[in-house]
């Protein structure tokens, strides 16, 4: 396997469970350490404006106490920019955010939001934070991301994962494939994530232009039944099988 495909584990919903009753258990930091042992290459955490799961203290602890790179998902706001500049995570993924949504529902409108996004991308980059933009697999959005100087894009895989197996899912997969190849041609590093499961991850993992997958909700849910280490290790096995062109055990 000459190609390297990184796995970023999103631990937001460990904090969701903790916050359901308050207190400190389960601890996202402990989850991050288990993820590292299970084969994760990085930790992703989304500090939402309403702090519904991950909190400010979590970001500080993850940045200071975990050896793996931290990918901070953040809205394009002055508050979140200040937090990112204070903690200086390895990477920051700018995502759209609406208070009424249960989870991130779609990609950024980079085409329409270029004026707002440009200074945020510049400030993060100058601070040594690697910036990615969470976008739909849309060529116009990719072109706009490149024009803004973002080094990384993350393709939203939600429509692909939500589609029924068969022609509908295949059509969504082809969009991801085309977008990933376009990103690579533009010189962008291409990541993907949102909604990926054991059943949907391998085709995306097999795409040569994809460098990283970020997966969270499914892994935390699966951990209820098999434990977090096993849930993550199995996802890593599916990704490795895709790189080999085989099938995970």
Swiss-Prot record:
InterPro entries the record matches: Aldolase_TIM, PyrdxlP_synth_PdxJ, Pyridoxine-5'_phos_synth
Organism field: Rhodospirillum rubrum (strain ATCC 11170 / ATH 1.1.1 / DSM 467 / LMG 4362 / NCIMB 8255 / S1)
Entry similarity comment: Belongs to the PNP synthase family.
Matching Pfam families: PdxJ
Site feature: Transition state stabilizer: 154
This protein's name: Pyridoxine 5'-phosphate synthase
Function according to Swiss-Prot or TrEMBL: Catalyzes the complicated ring closure reaction between the two acyclic compounds 1-deoxy-D-xylulose-5-phosphate (DXP) and 3-amino-2-oxopropyl phosphate (1-amino-acetone-3-phosphate or AAP) to form pyridoxine 5'-phosphate (PNP) and inorganic phosphate.
Classification via SUPFAM superfamilies: Pyridoxine 5'-phosphate synthase
Pathway this chain belongs to: Cofactor biosynthesis; pyridoxine 5'-phosphate biosynthesis; pyridoxine 5'-phosphate from D-erythrose 4-phosphate: step 5/5
Binding site for 1-deoxy-D-xylulose 5-phosphate: 12-13, 48, 53, 103
Lineage: Bacteria, Pseudomonadati, Pseudomonadota, Alphaproteobacteria, Rhodospirillales
Root EC class: transferase
Keyword Coiled coil: no
Active-site residues (renumbered): 46, 73, 194
GO biological process terms, semicolon-separated: pyridoxine biosynthetic process
Subcellular location: Cytoplasm
